[in-house]
């Protein structure tokens, strides 16, 4: 493993009824010390399943967004994210989370 990047990374994930995939999505992002701090912020659109509960069990912070919309969820997440770098992901594991460390490293090199 490379030296930890001196950066706080927040992964923002909008959700609505994603209990089937949210755990895999969170776990797909390596949590092996590649950055100084890594956290997950779930912006939930009033799920009626166990999405919020499962995300919290994985250590994610969860915010219930009463206003509807995918874009709204991201706007809320961006405003709330405590990280220096914000990464966005879909809740259904569409994108390979294992690539997040390399993408953030590349971003930091370009800074």
Where are these regions (language model features)?
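Structured catalytic core of nucleotide-sugar glycosyltransferases
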Residues: 1-111
């Amino acid at each position: 493993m490379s030296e930890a990047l001196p950066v706080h990374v927040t992964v923002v994930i909008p959700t609505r009824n994603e209990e089937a995939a949210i755990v895999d999505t969170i776990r797909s992002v390596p949590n092996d010390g590649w950055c100084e701090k890594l956290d997950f912020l779930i912006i939930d659109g009033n799920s009626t399943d166990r999405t919020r509960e499962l995300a919290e069990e994985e250590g994610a912070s969860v915010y219930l967004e009463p206003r509807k919309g995918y874009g709204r969820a991201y706007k809320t997440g961006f405003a709330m994210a405590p990280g220096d770098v914000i990464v966005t992901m879909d809740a259904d594991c569409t994108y390979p989370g294992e690539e997040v460390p390399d993408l953030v490293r590349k971003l930091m090199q370009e800074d």
